[in-house]
């Protein structure tokens, strides 16, 4: 949301409650994702100039940069619904974008995809193992399935299917 000209993170207890602003600064905060236990939020912020992944308590408090260390441009975090220690995100790598994974336990990241054209918008499936992401292929947007353990990527499209992006699942 934005009431001051820059995107900020807000929460509300219900549809009838007044939204409460969690981030208050001049940087842009976008793409919030809840931890599985509902106690933390991860999001994208350009507080240091370029987009990076941050986290904070869901009830407010200081935001802390997650040290992904794979790119100076990281965005679109998505928290694993089962494995609370894992966040997938989009990272700028070698002139394109790839899907990466951060592990809070090991405090390390790894690039999961090596597609020739950009991979963006990761979304976890409810099994906590697979991600669906958007890939640009020959000028078209396609949904792809990534097995995070084997790093195998499969297309979810049939040849005549049109553009598709921004997958979302209800659990």
Indicate residue ranges for each PLM-predicted region.
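Sequence signature of WD/YWTD-type beta-propeller architectures
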Residues: 1-171
């Amino acid at each position: 949301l934005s009431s001051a000209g820059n995107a900020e993170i807000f929460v509300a207890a219900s549809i009838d409650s007044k939204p409460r602003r969690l981030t208050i600064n001049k940087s842009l905060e976008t793409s919030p994702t809840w931890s599985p236990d509902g106690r933390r939020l991860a999001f994208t912020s350009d507080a240091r100039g370029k987009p990076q992944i941050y986290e904070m308590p869901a009830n407010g408090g200081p935001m802390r940069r997650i040290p992904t260390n794979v790119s100076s441009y990281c965005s679109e975090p998505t928290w694993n619904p089962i494995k609370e220690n894992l966040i997938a995100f989009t990272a700028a790598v070698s002139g394109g974008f790839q899907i990466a994974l951060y592990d809070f336990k090991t405090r390390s990241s790894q690039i999961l995809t090596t597609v020739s054209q950009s991979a963006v918008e990761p979304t976890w499936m409810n099994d906590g193992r697979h991600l669906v992401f958007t890939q640009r292929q020959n000028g078209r947007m396609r949904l792809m399935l990534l097995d995070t353990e084997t790093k195998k990527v499969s297309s979810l499209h049939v040849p005549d299917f049109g553009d598709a992006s921004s997958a979302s699942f209800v659990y």
